């Protein structure tokens, strides 16, 4: 009488688990850093889009919005039957408002525009800004 073998032995299952754990340990550090890097690239792209909207505003109005008006003024329709410069208020990838100042304090012309970055604190090295 022959004994048929069904399923895997405990040793075989343990080897598979060890292999999967080793692969995860090698891949995970690369994936974790990529999410933050992707958010930084999105913020840089957002700053470029905001620059276009601000430049269009300046062409229409003769000046950039004041710091008090802020970026929110870009979501107001330009005039009767006209679309706003932005469809919705601009939030960075960390769901915080972009910082806007006009006149600029970090540049000799124009405006300052920045995201506080991952840490949410202004003036730290992870900030994404339109100067430097």
Q: Where in the sequence are the language-model features?
A:
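Residue-level recognition of hydrophobic positions within alpha-helical transmembrane segments
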Residues: 8, 40-42, 51, 123
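Low-complexity, acidic interaction segments enriched in glycine
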Residues: 48, 52-132
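Conserved amphipathic alpha-helical interaction elements at protein-protein interfaces in regulatory
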Residues: 3, 33, 37, 56-60
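Short, contiguous strand/loop micro-motifs
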Residues: 3, 40-41, 78
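Short, contiguous, well-ordered secondary-structure segments
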Residues: 1-2, 108
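Aliphatic-rich helix starts adjacent to a transmembrane/signal segment
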Residues: 30-49
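Generic secondary-structure boundary signal with a strong preference for alpha-helix termini
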Residues: 19, 33-36, 107-108, 131
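N-terminal single-pass transmembrane signal-anchor helix
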Residues: 4-31
